From Swiss-Prot:
Entry's Gene Ontology BP terms: cytoplasmic microtubule organization; meiotic cell cycle; microtubule nucleation; mitotic cell cycle; mitotic cytokinetic process; motile cilium assembly; spindle assembly
Primary location group: cytoplasm
Knockout consequences: Knockdown of expression by morpholino results in increased number of cells arrested in cytokinesis, reduced volume of median bodies, increase in disorganized cells impertinent for cytokinesis, and reduced length of the caudal flagella. However, knockdown does not have an effect on the number of cells defective in cytokinesis or abscission.
Protein localization: Cytoplasm, Cytoskeleton, Flagellum axoneme; Cytoplasm, Cytoskeleton, Flagellum basal body; Cytoplasm, Cytoskeleton
Subunit structure: Component of the gamma-tubulin small complex (gamma-TuSC) composed of tubulin gamma chain, gamma-tubulin complex protein 2 (GCP2) and gamma-tubulin complex protein 3 (GCP3). Interacts with tubulin gamma chain.
Family listed: Belongs to the TUBGCP family.
InterPro entries, per database record: GCP (IPR007259), GCP_C (IPR040457), GCP_C_sf (IPR042241), GCP_N (IPR041470)
Chain segments annotated as coiled-coil in the UniProt record: none
Identification of the protein by name: Gamma-tubulin small complex component GCP3
One term under GO cellular component: ciliary basal body
Record's keyword terms, sorted: Cell projection, Cilium, Cytoplasm, Cytoskeleton, Flagellum, Microtubule
Lineage: Eukaryota, Metamonada, Diplomonadida, Hexamitidae, Giardiinae
A GO MF term: gamma-tubulin binding
Primary role: Component of the gamma-tubulin small complex (gamma-TuSC) involved in microtubule (MT) nucleation for the formation of median bodies and in the biogenesis of flagella. Gamma-TuSC may be required for the correct positioning of EB1 within the trophozoites.
Length: 892
């Protein structure tokens, strides 16, 4: 066993060990030194690095290590590696040398080498001095201040006996020639000097032994041992060990370079706060280096002591350098991206990195939380470097947040001032996730939007949260809103945000319902535009039919509309509702649209696009009511013409003939062709009227009435303006699908309107509700095709009714039915009636087919839809088609 240990020591030193070296080696192997937490190098790795590159020596070392391990001679796995350090501390001079030069020189070693060690007394004195050296090593290296235990006499005697036997075998090779000693002294680096140089390097300053070199490829500087020491006296293992300590200087220099580069450019508040936090971290680093420097001045510090402290310092400064490099090197990073990067480090599994990342995040996020607090309180933006952006004509990054998983259509973007003032950006450069959870982001955004809405749209400039609430917001620790905390809904700051959100929502709903009278305006739309006050449209039809046709102008039409309102039950509505009724004339001045003028803030709920839908519904009912009026006029003309012709026949028969004529003989006097025409006209007129009444009844009782009843019930229970907007929009959408109206009322323009001339391209104008195009597909191509075919057929039927009314009026304009001209006109009217029946049957079949196809169309924008309404209307139309005049065409 003893020979194996000596062989291992020779392989390490590449020479015969001296007596002192052997004794220290044996003492270490037989002692219970505590494991010093200096580094992660183990014994085997250290020994093998010393003989790296020599296959023969490597095999011999492996065999020695194997034998030692099998015999359990090594009590400590790392003991062998620390032999060199023990030898170094014995003389207070640290020799960094290659294996063939490795030696420790003591101040008295030269004298000891020249004097023969032969007497027993000298050996005992030498043993005592080594024992004292051993205690010194314990206290300095391992900080073992309580090491009062002495080596047992048995162990000491055994070691000395072993050393005596070995000394007897030694030859003159133990002694070091004076010539070799002089050469070694030249290449020796004192430990005090190397520690001083390493402290300089840790501050980024090159010294006597370490120099700062910049990598030509990456441009990154790092500390290395100067070349002359690498080639003469320092092994690669020892140089690498020291360069690890000196790398603190590289990390410090890297942080300093990044901070200097950033301060020379324009930077946002987040980047500035991060730089301030990094400066604080570097100041603490410099203070710790100063303490090391003062400790080195007061008492000599060993390299091992410096290593124990430097490893901890290196962890912290390297973490600062990594975070600074990731956040500051790329100048294109936005503030949210920087915060998300730091947030990732704050969630790191390593405690040190987690602590540093969290402290930097708290400091760097201060401007962001100030921005959030100002947005919540004032409803205005301090800057645009974060996720909330003003909506402009160039906004293409509007993020739609789903507010309720059960109501899919809540995520539908609606052209409303509530949505079009501000938006959450969907740009990857501005996203707050994972810094903030989507729930917290939505709450904060909606609170500020409510504040802005109350101040600007509601013209309530003085509106403000109570001072107690404002004080709570300003004093709240918004760092608790970070997604690592806010997952707990009961957390104090999250509960505060939820309470403020509820307060702002109730304030908006109250001012919409009470001050701006939402329900009154919805009733006005219901009774006037949607025709639920059944006598308004007939009254308007009567007034317009009594006046001559021609071009229609806004002022004259307004007078007629006001006259119609005053002559029906609509006049009972409040004056502020009647004052909103308006008229819109198309460019041809032949058609008009009764409309309803909505002002802010109600335009956020009843949007211009939805008003357009109401105008369309009024136009459909106007066509049907006009057609119904024409059908009533046809029966009046028929009855009037019949009475006039009967009177003419009786007059021609004379006073006496009146008593001779009876019904049968009277009908025989009337031409058969005229009788057949009147009979067919009456039949098709009745069936057409049945169709018109079925459509009017369907619109009023199946489409409008149930949806508005549901709407009013939902609005009463609504707690947020988003709920009000949603419920009204769902009512409009449902009516559109029930009435087969395929107008994408969110698309108010093919393209955003150009900016005003006075505004520059760099400052896009603020949008209103009609300026944004919503790319959402409300109706599929199949749906649009079906709905368009249905209304095209409806328009054609109404147009044919008007032509039929004209044909009947021309025929019944004749004074006598016994003239040749009347006979010719009767034939023309009969031919037109045949064409009308064919057209009526065709369009009726088209409408029935459309209703049948509607039962299979998908409706993705509504949570639920009852397709039975289509079946009910189809049954009504089929009843019209079963008449004898239309049955054959229907079968075809």
């Amino acid at each position: 066993m003893l020979e194996t240990i000596l062989a291992l020591l020779r392989e390490i030193l590449h020479r015969e060990p001296s007596k002192e070296e052997r004794q220290l080696f044996f003492t270490l192997l037989s002692s219970n030194f505590p494991v010093p937490p200096l580094d992660d190098w183990n014994t085997v790795a250290g020994i093998r690095l010393a003989v790296l590159g020599n296959p023969v020596e490597s095999r011999r070392v492996d065999s020695c290590l194997k034998e030692l391990s099998e015999n359990k001679a090594l009590k400590n796995v790392r003991s062998t590696l620390y032999v060199l350090r023990l030898l170094a501390n014995q003389s207070k001079a640290f020799v960094l040398a290659t294996p063939h030069n490795l030696l420790v020189q003591d101040n008295t070693q030269t004298t000891m080498q020249s004097a023969p060690l032969t007497t027993t007394k000298t050996n005992k004195l030498h043993g005592k001095s080594k024992h004292k050296s051993k205690k010194s090593i314990r206290s300095i290296l391992f900080k073992d201040f309580d090491s009062t235990s002495e080596e047992s006499d048995t162990e000491t005697s055994a070691v000395e006996a072993c050393m005596a036997r070995i000394d007897q075998k030694e030859t003159s090779t133990r002694l070091i020639p004076n010539e070799s000693s002089g050469k070694l002294s030249k290449d020796t680096i004192l430990e005090h000097a190397i520690v001083r140089d390493l402290i300089y390097a840790m501050q980024g300053l090159p010294g006597q032994y370490f120099e700062l070199i910049k990598d030509p490829t990456s441009g990154i500087s790092h500390f290395v041992l100067q070349r002359q020491y690498q080639s003469l006296s320092v092994s690669q293992t020892a140089a690498t060990f020291c360069e690890r300590i000196a790398s603190c200087g590289f990390f410090y220099t890297r942080c300093t370079e990044l901070l200097n580069a950033v301060t020379k450019t324009n930077m946002g508040k987040t980047r500035a706060s991060l730089c301030e936090a990094l400066h604080t971290g570097l100041s603490e680093y410099r203070q710790r280096i100063s303490l090391l420097d003062s400790q080195l001045t007061e008492e000599q510090m060993t390299l091992v002591e410096l290593t124990a402290v430097a490893n901890l310092i290196r962890e912290e400064i390297s973490t600062l350098a990594v975070i600074a490099d990731n956040c500051l090197y790329d100048k294109s990073l936005t503030s949210p991206q920087i915060l998300n990067i730091i947030f990732g480090y704050s969630l790191h599994g390593d405690r040190k990195m987690h602590h540093i990342g969290q402290s930097l995040l708290i400091k760097a996020s201060e401007p962001f939380f100030d921005y959030l607090k100002h947005w919540i309180i004032e409803g205005s933006l301090l800057s645009t470097e974060y996720f909330i952006q003003p909506t402009t004509s160039n906004s293409t990054d509007i993020l739609i947040l789903q507010t309720n998983n059960l109501l899919v259509s809540r995520s539908i973007f609606i052209n409303s001032n509530w949505y079009n003032k501000f938006h959450i950006s969907s740009s990857p450069d501005l996203k707050t996730h994972p810094l903030l959870s989507p729930y917290v982001t939505k709450l904060c955004f909606e609170i500020g939007r409510a504040s802005a809405f109350l101040r600007e749209d509601c013209n309530n400039i003085t509106w403000r949260f109570p001072e107690s609430i404002v004080a709570l917001i300003r004093e709240a620790n918004f760092a608790k809103l970070l997604s690592s905390y806010s997952s707990d809904a009961s957390e104090g700051t999250v509960k505060l945000i939820r309470s403020i959100h509820m307060l702002s929502s109730k304030a908006v709903v109250a001012i919409i319902k009470r001050q701006f009278l939402l329900f009154d305006h919805l009733n006005g739309i219901l009774y006037i535009l949607l025709g639920m006050q059944g006598d308004f449209i007939p009254s308007l039809c009567s007034i317009l039919s009594s006046t001559s046709g021609g071009d229609k102008y806004k002022l004259s039409m307004l007078e007629k509309i006001e006259q119609a309102m005053m002559s029906c039950n609509v006049s009972n509505l409040p004056s502020h509702v009647l004052g909103c009724v308006d008229v819109r004339i198309d460019n041809s001045k032949s058609n008009f649209y009764v409309t309803y003028s909505i002002k802010d803030p109600l335009t956020s709920i009843i949007t211009p696009g939805q008003i357009r839908i109401y105008e369309t519904i009024f136009q459909i009912q106007w066509r049907l009511r006009s057609a119904d009026d024409k059908l009533d006029q046809i029966i009046l003309l028929t009855n009037f013409f019949y009475r006039r012709n009967t009177q003419q026949i009786l007059t021609n028969a004379g006073r006496v003939g009146i008593f001779r004529l009876h019904y049968r003989t009277l009908t025989e006097e009337v031409p058969l062709a005229y009788t057949l025409y009147v009979a067919r006209l009456s039949c098709i007129r009745n069936r057409t009227k049945q169709l018109v009444l079925a459509l009017l009844n369907y619109i009023s009782h199946d489409c409008i009435a149930p949806e508005y009843m549901t709407l009013f019930a939902n609005l009463e229970a609504a707690e947020t303006i988003k709920d009000i907007i949603y419920y009204h929009d769902i009512a409009v959408r449902t009516i559109c699908y029930k009435m087969l109206i395929s107008i994408n009322y969110h698309k108010m323009a093919d393209a955003p309107l150009p900016a005003p001339k006075e505004s520059s391209g760099h400052h896009p104008r603020q949008l209103r509700s009609c300026d944004i195009y919503n790319g959402q597909v409300m109706f599929t191509d199949k749906t649009i095709s079906i709905f368009s075919d249905f209304h095209t057929s409806l328009v054609k039927i109404c147009a044919q009714i008007a032509l039929l009314h004209g044909s009947v009026a021309e025929l019944f304009n004749f004074q006598s039915i016994f003239t040749q001209d009347f006979t010719m006109k009767l034939q023309e009217a009969a031919n037109f009636l045949d064409a009308y029946v064919r057209s009526f049957n065709t369009e009726l079949n088209t409408m029935i087919t459309c209703l049948q196809r509607c039962r299979s169309i998908p409706i993705p924008v509504l949570d639920e839809f009852d397709y039975s309404h289509y079946e009910n209307l189809e049954a009504s139309l089929l009843a019209v088609g079963m008449h004898s005049e239309t049955h054959s065409s229907h079968k075809r």
